[in-house]
Amino acid sequence: MAKLNTKHRVCSRESSISSLLASCSLSGSSGCSSDGSFQYKDQLYSSASEALQAYIDDFDLSRGHPGANTDKVNIDGEVGNGPHFSSCVLTPNNALANLDDKRHFNPLYYRRETINDMDSISLTTDDLLRLPADGCFSFSHVTSDHRQKKKSKKYIGRQDSLDIKDSPSFYAPKSKDNTLPPYVYTNINGKKCGDKIELLILKAKKNLKQSTEDLAKPVEKDDSPCSLDKLEAERTWENVPVTFKSPVPVKADDSPQQNSRTKCLEDFLNDCNQSSTLSGGKHHGPVEALKQMLFNLQAVQESFDQNKSTEPEERRKQVSEDDFSKLQMKENMIPITRSLHKALQHLSRLRDLVDDTSGRQSPKM
């Protein structure tokens, strides 16, 4: 043990010994020896450090050889069989006789007394191994009455935490930050519940049950939109009836002039379709259209010549004016007549050219 202590921590000999073995008390004895000597394995040591060093050497031998045993370091000469140091502070029967009542009930007084009187504290081997390297550690005076109360509180807390499962309701006071303070769980009777982990588990289970019940209730009342029946049902919002109204002609009550124009256009288109069948094809070319125009003009001219020979000149003037007015009306009514008028002009020029060429050729003959 001494080798391990030198390897893992470096500290002074006096500080470690004074902190580790400030005092040694016996579990079976009621006091300390008057001469202040320490006995270990039938040997008396004048100081605690020598007894502790002997104990450490035996402990190292016992670790190397499991068959070896170590005894207790005793003050009054008793020898034990196990490496056990008493962890409780023992006082003589008349130790509190001369103390004042205020000192007896003041924990700070006992804390100062234990720190000042280091010989009244004993440690076990495990406690010695857990000490820091510098050897300093803090002590707190714990009386036997306090330990008994603490054990009873622990037992009551465990019993109450187990009984909480059977109790129908319990509450846990919360702080300002909505956090549960440790060991402040109480039930209806006001008893403290020490085991907060079980309370949290029970509370979580209760919340889960409530959430599942709340989710199950609306599903039972109203059908879920994610169910197969709802998905396979007809979607009324997609089959919206659409009413189609018959088209209403715009400006149905037009003037009689527009009606006459539409009739003239229809008649002209019908005549064009009939002439295209006579010319030998539905889609006639421009030459065939000119031929049709020439034929029509020749027929009009022949009829005009016949009327000219029979009627007087005044009648001719009236007829020419009427024809001219009719042509103007046709030009105004049908836009296509403009192109026809231009074609007539071209044809008249062609006819004049033909007549001129024929007149020039006749004198030569």
Swiss-Prot record:
Chief location bin: secreted
Species in which this protein is naturally found: Rattus norvegicus (Rat)
Protein name per Swiss-Prot or TrEMBL: Lung adenoma susceptibility protein 2 homolog
One Pfam short name: LAS2
Positions of region (Disordered): 304-328
Reported function: Might play a role in cell proliferation.
Signal sequence region: 1-31
Keyword Secreted included in the entry's annotation: yes
Domain of life assignment: Eukaryota
GO biological process, one term: negative regulation of cell population proliferation
Gene designation: Las2
Keywords, ordered alphabetically: Phosphoprotein, Secreted, Signal
GO cellular component terms given for this protein: extracellular region
Subcellular location: Secreted
Residues with Phosphoserine modification: S161
Basic and acidic residues: compositionally biased ranges: 308-328
